[in-house]
A protein has these predicted regions:
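Generic structural signal for short, solvent-exposed loop/turn connectors between secondary structure elements
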Residues: 1, 71-74, 114-115, 182, ...
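N-terminal Rossmann-like NAD(P)+-binding domain of SDR-like oxidoreductases, especially those catalyzing
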Residues: 1-180, 220, 306, 311-314, ...
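Short, solvent-exposed loop/helix junctions and linker helices
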Residues: 6, 89, 97-100, 150, ...
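C-terminal substrate-binding subdomain of Rossmann-fold SDR/epimerase-dehydratase oxidoreductases
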Residues: 16, 58, 198-323
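Alpha-helix N-cap/loop-to-helix initiation residues
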Residues: 37, 62, 187, 246-247, ...
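Generic alpha-helical secondary structure signal
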Residues: 39, 75, 125, 159, ...
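NAD(P)-dependent short-chain dehydrogenase/reductase
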Residues: 43, 130-137, 147, 159-231, ...
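Residues in well-ordered alpha-helical elements
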Residues: 64-67, 86, 93, 104, ...
Length: 323
Protein backbone atom coordinates (compact mmCIF):
# COMPACT_ATOMS: atom_id res chain seq x y z
CA UNK A 1 0.00 0.00 0.00
CA UNK A 2 1.15 3.54 -0.77
CA UNK A 3 0.39 6.15 1.89
CA UNK A 4 0.54 9.92 2.09
CA UNK A 5 1.08 10.83 5.74
CA UNK A 6 0.63 14.52 6.51
CA UNK A 7 2.43 15.93 9.52
CA UNK A 8 4.66 12.88 9.66
CA UNK A 9 7.53 14.77 11.28
CA UNK A 10 5.42 15.71 14.29
CA UNK A 11 4.97 13.79 17.51
CA UNK A 12 2.18 11.33 16.67
CA UNK A 13 2.83 11.37 12.92
CA UNK A 14 6.49 10.37 13.23
CA UNK A 15 5.63 7.59 15.67
CA UNK A 16 3.08 6.33 13.14
CA UNK A 17 5.56 6.43 10.24
CA UNK A 18 8.08 4.41 12.28
CA UNK A 19 5.37 1.97 13.41
CA UNK A 20 3.98 1.47 9.92
CA UNK A 21 7.32 0.92 8.17
CA UNK A 22 8.35 -1.57 10.83
CA UNK A 23 5.08 -3.52 10.70
CA UNK A 24 4.57 -3.31 6.92
CA UNK A 25 8.04 -3.04 5.33
CA UNK A 26 6.49 -3.46 1.88
CA UNK A 27 4.46 -0.25 2.30
CA UNK A 28 5.72 3.00 0.82
CA UNK A 29 5.15 6.27 2.67
CA UNK A 30 5.34 9.86 1.46
CA UNK A 31 5.65 12.15 4.46
CA UNK A 32 4.41 15.69 3.77
CA UNK A 33 5.36 18.10 6.53
CA UNK A 34 5.82 21.87 6.63
CA UNK A 35 8.42 21.55 9.42
CA UNK A 36 6.96 24.15 11.75
CA UNK A 37 8.45 24.38 15.24
CA UNK A 38 6.84 21.04 16.20
CA UNK A 39 8.13 19.10 13.17
CA UNK A 40 11.49 17.40 13.59
CA UNK A 41 13.21 15.22 11.01
CA UNK A 42 15.49 13.82 13.71
CA UNK A 43 12.48 11.75 14.80
CA UNK A 44 12.84 9.87 11.50
CA UNK A 45 16.62 9.44 11.27
CA UNK A 46 16.26 5.66 11.38
CA UNK A 47 14.17 5.55 8.18
CA UNK A 48 15.54 8.48 6.14
CA UNK A 49 17.51 6.11 3.87
CA UNK A 50 14.71 3.55 3.59
CA UNK A 51 13.80 3.26 -0.12
CA UNK A 52 10.14 2.87 0.91
CA UNK A 53 10.14 6.29 2.59
CA UNK A 54 10.12 9.76 1.02
CA UNK A 55 10.05 13.11 2.79
CA UNK A 56 8.52 16.17 1.12
CA UNK A 57 8.72 19.53 2.85
CA UNK A 58 5.62 21.49 2.01
CA UNK A 59 2.32 22.97 3.11
CA UNK A 60 -0.98 21.06 3.07
CA UNK A 61 -2.58 24.37 2.02
CA UNK A 62 -0.76 24.16 -1.35
CA UNK A 63 -3.26 22.51 -3.76
CA UNK A 64 -0.77 21.90 -6.58
CA UNK A 65 1.65 20.10 -4.27
CA UNK A 66 -1.10 18.13 -2.57
CA UNK A 67 -2.59 17.02 -5.91
CA UNK A 68 0.80 15.87 -7.20
CA UNK A 69 1.35 13.68 -4.13
CA UNK A 70 -2.16 12.25 -3.77
CA UNK A 71 -1.97 11.00 -7.38
CA UNK A 72 0.82 8.64 -6.26
CA UNK A 73 -0.89 7.02 -3.27
CA UNK A 74 -3.80 4.80 -2.24
CA UNK A 75 -4.48 6.30 1.18
CA UNK A 76 -4.16 9.65 2.97
CA UNK A 77 -3.51 9.60 6.73
CA UNK A 78 -3.98 13.16 7.93
CA UNK A 79 -2.12 14.15 11.11
CA UNK A 80 -0.94 17.64 10.11
CA UNK A 81 -2.38 20.23 12.48
CA UNK A 82 -1.61 23.06 14.81
CA UNK A 83 -2.39 21.49 18.20
CA UNK A 84 -1.28 23.59 21.16
CA UNK A 85 -4.25 25.14 22.98
CA UNK A 86 -2.23 27.96 24.56
CA UNK A 87 -0.84 29.02 21.18
CA UNK A 88 -4.37 29.00 19.71
CA UNK A 89 -5.49 31.43 22.40
CA UNK A 90 -2.62 33.81 21.65
CA UNK A 91 -3.00 33.58 17.84
CA UNK A 92 -5.88 31.57 16.32
CA UNK A 93 -5.01 32.38 12.68
CA UNK A 94 -2.53 29.51 12.01
CA UNK A 95 -5.06 27.06 13.49
CA UNK A 96 -7.82 28.23 11.17
CA UNK A 97 -5.53 28.08 8.13
CA UNK A 98 -3.85 24.72 8.74
CA UNK A 99 -6.61 22.79 10.48
CA UNK A 100 -9.54 23.94 8.35
CA UNK A 101 -8.18 25.20 5.02
CA UNK A 102 -5.44 22.54 4.95
CA UNK A 103 -7.96 19.76 5.54
CA UNK A 104 -10.15 21.17 2.77
CA UNK A 105 -7.22 21.15 0.31
CA UNK A 106 -6.45 17.52 1.17
CA UNK A 107 -10.08 16.47 0.82
CA UNK A 108 -10.30 18.16 -2.57
CA UNK A 109 -7.11 16.41 -3.64
CA UNK A 110 -8.49 13.05 -2.57
CA UNK A 111 -11.82 13.72 -4.31
CA UNK A 112 -10.31 14.90 -7.60
CA UNK A 113 -7.84 12.03 -7.82
CA UNK A 114 -10.16 9.05 -7.73
CA UNK A 115 -11.86 9.41 -4.34
CA UNK A 116 -8.84 8.15 -2.41
CA UNK A 117 -9.28 6.52 0.99
CA UNK A 118 -8.89 9.22 3.68
CA UNK A 119 -8.31 8.84 7.42
CA UNK A 120 -8.55 11.98 9.56
CA UNK A 121 -6.97 12.18 13.02
CA UNK A 122 -8.78 14.44 15.46
CA UNK A 123 -9.15 15.10 19.18
CA UNK A 124 -11.60 14.54 22.02
CA UNK A 125 -11.41 18.28 22.73
CA UNK A 126 -14.06 18.87 20.05
CA UNK A 127 -16.65 17.58 22.55
CA UNK A 128 -15.97 20.26 25.15
CA UNK A 129 -15.71 19.44 28.84
CA UNK A 130 -17.21 16.93 31.26
CA UNK A 131 -18.15 17.68 34.85
CA UNK A 132 -15.42 16.96 37.37
CA UNK A 133 -16.36 13.92 39.46
CA UNK A 134 -19.03 12.67 37.05
CA UNK A 135 -18.99 9.21 35.44
CA UNK A 136 -19.93 10.55 32.00
CA UNK A 137 -17.60 9.80 29.09
CA UNK A 138 -17.34 11.02 25.53
CA UNK A 139 -18.67 8.64 22.89
CA UNK A 140 -19.14 8.77 19.13
CA UNK A 141 -22.63 10.23 19.70
CA UNK A 142 -21.52 13.08 21.99
CA UNK A 143 -22.52 16.49 20.54
CA UNK A 144 -19.71 18.83 19.56
CA UNK A 145 -19.04 21.73 21.94
CA UNK A 146 -15.49 23.06 21.42
CA UNK A 147 -14.20 25.70 23.84
CA UNK A 148 -10.88 26.91 22.38
CA UNK A 149 -9.81 28.15 18.93
CA UNK A 150 -7.81 24.92 18.61
CA UNK A 151 -10.72 22.59 19.35
CA UNK A 152 -13.09 24.70 17.25
CA UNK A 153 -10.73 24.41 14.27
CA UNK A 154 -10.53 20.63 14.70
CA UNK A 155 -14.32 20.39 15.03
CA UNK A 156 -14.63 22.30 11.76
CA UNK A 157 -12.23 19.93 10.03
CA UNK A 158 -14.15 16.90 11.33
CA UNK A 159 -17.38 18.29 9.88
CA UNK A 160 -15.68 18.94 6.53
CA UNK A 161 -14.41 15.37 6.37
CA UNK A 162 -17.90 13.98 7.06
CA UNK A 163 -19.41 16.36 4.51
CA UNK A 164 -17.08 15.05 1.81
CA UNK A 165 -18.24 11.52 2.59
CA UNK A 166 -21.93 12.44 2.61
CA UNK A 167 -21.77 14.73 -0.45
CA UNK A 168 -19.13 13.15 -2.67
CA UNK A 169 -18.90 9.58 -1.38
CA UNK A 170 -15.28 10.04 -0.28
CA UNK A 171 -14.26 6.90 1.65
CA UNK A 172 -13.31 8.45 4.99
CA UNK A 173 -12.84 7.45 8.60
CA UNK A 174 -12.25 9.73 11.57
CA UNK A 175 -10.62 9.04 14.92
CA UNK A 176 -10.90 11.32 17.94
CA UNK A 177 -8.16 10.55 20.42
CA UNK A 178 -7.34 11.31 24.02
CA UNK A 179 -4.25 13.33 24.97
CA UNK A 180 -1.13 11.47 23.85
CA UNK A 181 2.22 11.03 25.56
CA UNK A 182 5.42 9.16 24.71
CA UNK A 183 8.66 9.49 22.71
CA UNK A 184 9.30 12.50 20.45
CA UNK A 185 6.67 14.75 22.03
CA UNK A 186 7.61 18.42 21.76
CA UNK A 187 8.49 19.58 25.29
CA UNK A 188 5.70 22.14 25.63
CA UNK A 189 3.04 19.58 26.62
CA UNK A 190 2.51 18.26 30.16
CA UNK A 191 4.69 15.14 30.09
CA UNK A 192 7.62 16.43 28.04
CA UNK A 193 7.69 19.79 29.81
CA UNK A 194 7.52 18.25 33.29
CA UNK A 195 10.22 15.65 32.61
CA UNK A 196 12.64 17.99 30.86
CA UNK A 197 12.17 20.76 33.42
CA UNK A 198 13.16 18.32 36.17
CA UNK A 199 16.19 17.22 34.14
CA UNK A 200 17.15 20.90 33.82
CA UNK A 201 16.68 21.55 37.53
CA UNK A 202 13.66 23.79 36.94
CA UNK A 203 10.24 23.90 38.58
CA UNK A 204 7.32 22.02 37.02
CA UNK A 205 4.44 24.42 36.21
CA UNK A 206 0.90 23.28 37.02
CA UNK A 207 -2.12 25.29 35.84
CA UNK A 208 -4.57 26.55 38.45
CA UNK A 209 -5.42 24.01 41.15
CA UNK A 210 -4.03 21.09 39.12
CA UNK A 211 -7.30 19.16 39.34
CA UNK A 212 -7.92 19.09 35.60
CA UNK A 213 -8.52 15.56 34.38
CA UNK A 214 -7.51 14.10 31.02
CA UNK A 215 -7.67 10.65 29.48
CA UNK A 216 -4.05 9.80 28.57
CA UNK A 217 -3.14 7.58 25.62
CA UNK A 218 0.34 6.16 25.01
CA UNK A 219 1.34 7.09 21.48
CA UNK A 220 2.21 3.52 20.41
CA UNK A 221 -1.27 2.34 21.44
CA UNK A 222 -2.65 5.18 19.34
CA UNK A 223 -0.60 4.08 16.30
CA UNK A 224 -1.97 0.56 16.59
CA UNK A 225 -5.54 1.88 16.78
CA UNK A 226 -5.09 4.01 13.65
CA UNK A 227 -3.61 1.01 11.84
CA UNK A 228 -6.67 -1.09 12.71
CA UNK A 229 -9.06 1.63 11.55
CA UNK A 230 -7.21 1.88 8.24
CA UNK A 231 -7.31 -1.90 7.79
CA UNK A 232 -10.75 -2.80 9.13
CA UNK A 233 -12.70 0.35 10.02
CA UNK A 234 -16.08 0.95 8.41
CA UNK A 235 -16.04 3.74 5.84
CA UNK A 236 -17.91 6.81 7.01
CA UNK A 237 -17.51 5.94 10.68
CA UNK A 238 -15.88 7.68 13.62
CA UNK A 239 -13.90 5.87 16.31
CA UNK A 240 -12.89 7.26 19.70
CA UNK A 241 -9.48 6.17 21.02
CA UNK A 242 -8.81 6.44 24.75
CA UNK A 243 -6.33 5.24 27.32
CA UNK A 244 -6.22 3.56 30.71
CA UNK A 245 -5.83 6.63 32.93
CA UNK A 246 -9.34 7.98 33.23
CA UNK A 247 -9.93 10.43 36.08
CA UNK A 248 -6.30 10.98 37.01
CA UNK A 249 -5.64 14.68 37.54
CA UNK A 250 -2.77 16.72 36.16
CA UNK A 251 -1.33 17.22 39.63
CA UNK A 252 -1.40 13.46 40.25
CA UNK A 253 0.52 12.90 37.02
CA UNK A 254 3.11 15.52 37.93
CA UNK A 255 3.51 13.93 41.37
CA UNK A 256 4.08 10.53 39.72
CA UNK A 257 6.73 12.00 37.42
CA UNK A 258 8.43 13.67 40.38
CA UNK A 259 8.36 10.43 42.36
CA UNK A 260 9.83 8.36 39.52
CA UNK A 261 12.56 10.98 39.05
CA UNK A 262 13.42 11.05 42.77
CA UNK A 263 12.37 14.65 43.30
CA UNK A 264 10.01 16.26 45.83
CA UNK A 265 6.79 18.25 45.63
CA UNK A 266 8.85 21.38 46.27
CA UNK A 267 9.64 21.18 42.55
CA UNK A 268 5.99 21.99 41.67
CA UNK A 269 5.01 25.57 40.86
CA UNK A 270 1.33 26.46 40.54
CA UNK A 271 0.81 29.04 37.80
CA UNK A 272 -2.05 31.19 36.50
CA UNK A 273 -4.78 29.11 34.89
CA UNK A 274 -5.37 28.90 31.15
CA UNK A 275 -8.43 30.81 29.84
CA UNK A 276 -11.38 28.50 29.12
CA UNK A 277 -9.60 25.49 30.62
CA UNK A 278 -11.78 22.37 30.25
CA UNK A 279 -12.13 20.53 33.55
CA UNK A 280 -12.39 16.90 32.49
CA UNK A 281 -12.15 14.64 29.44
CA UNK A 282 -12.85 10.90 29.41
CA UNK A 283 -13.34 8.56 26.46
CA UNK A 284 -15.56 5.51 26.08
CA UNK A 285 -13.64 3.37 23.57
CA UNK A 286 -16.21 0.54 23.48
CA UNK A 287 -16.89 0.92 19.75
CA UNK A 288 -13.32 0.41 18.53
CA UNK A 289 -12.90 -2.41 21.03
CA UNK A 290 -16.03 -4.28 19.91
CA UNK A 291 -15.71 -3.64 16.16
CA UNK A 292 -11.94 -3.83 15.66
CA UNK A 293 -10.68 -5.63 18.77
CA UNK A 294 -8.49 -2.75 19.92
CA UNK A 295 -7.61 -1.94 23.51
CA UNK A 296 -4.60 -0.13 25.02
CA UNK A 297 -1.71 -2.51 25.65
CA UNK A 298 0.47 -0.32 27.85
CA UNK A 299 -0.35 0.39 31.48
CA UNK A 300 0.01 4.02 32.47
CA UNK A 301 2.82 3.52 34.97
CA UNK A 302 4.80 1.29 32.61
CA UNK A 303 4.46 3.73 29.70
CA UNK A 304 5.17 6.76 31.90
CA UNK A 305 8.42 5.24 33.14
CA UNK A 306 9.39 4.33 29.56
CA UNK A 307 8.70 7.93 28.52
CA UNK A 308 10.85 9.31 31.35
CA UNK A 309 13.69 7.00 30.33
CA UNK A 310 13.35 8.08 26.70
CA UNK A 311 13.79 11.76 27.61
CA UNK A 312 16.75 10.90 29.83
CA UNK A 313 18.42 8.99 27.00
CA UNK A 314 17.64 11.61 24.33
CA UNK A 315 18.80 14.83 25.95
CA UNK A 316 20.39 16.09 22.72
CA UNK A 317 17.00 15.79 21.01
CA UNK A 318 14.96 17.87 23.46
CA UNK A 319 17.58 20.40 24.59
CA UNK A 320 17.77 21.84 21.06
CA UNK A 321 14.01 22.33 21.08
CA UNK A 322 13.98 24.21 24.39
CA UNK A 323 16.72 26.73 23.54
Amino acid sequence: MKLLVTGGAGFIGSNFVLYRLKKYPQDSIINLDKLTYAGNLENLKSVEKNPQYEFVQGDICNPQLVDSLIKKVDLVVHFAAETHVDRSILDPAPFIKTNIEGTYVLLEGARKNGNKRFHHISTDEVFGALELGSKTKFSESTPYNPHSPYSASKASSDHLVRAYHDTFGLPITISNCANNYGPYQFPEKLFGLSITNILEGKKVPVYGDGLYVRDWLYVLDHCEAIDLIIQKGRVGETYLIGGLTQDISNIEIVKKIIKYMNKTENDIEYVKDRPGHDRRYAIDWTKINKELGWSPKHSFDEALQATIEWYKENENWWRKLKT
